[in-house]
């Protein structure tokens, strides 16, 4: 269900520390390195985006920086996203992604910008407001989850 977290390995010996990344890139509010079983290191970044194209610029700078070459995939999210909550990260990823617009490839590495887009970035529609379930609704869903989705 929506409460389950993905299991990840924590062997980040080749990867830079979040502190080092945040020192080099001041616009990064939080970051987390995931070592997936496929041995592809993924960096989740909560980016304080204040200008058009900032997500793309961050990704390009990150992928060009030799100190971070152990990270094969970088995903830039909005600064308010709790990167510790994998369910929320995946929800943001799949709902904000436009593969034609948001994928950047560099030397076998991938950057994905799923930050909110500004009109200057070619996004002409209104970006939808975020909604948050009340604690009452969450409790109701939790009570019915096993009835709705048999595991």
PLM feature spans:
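Charged, compositionally biased interaction regions
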Residues: 1-151
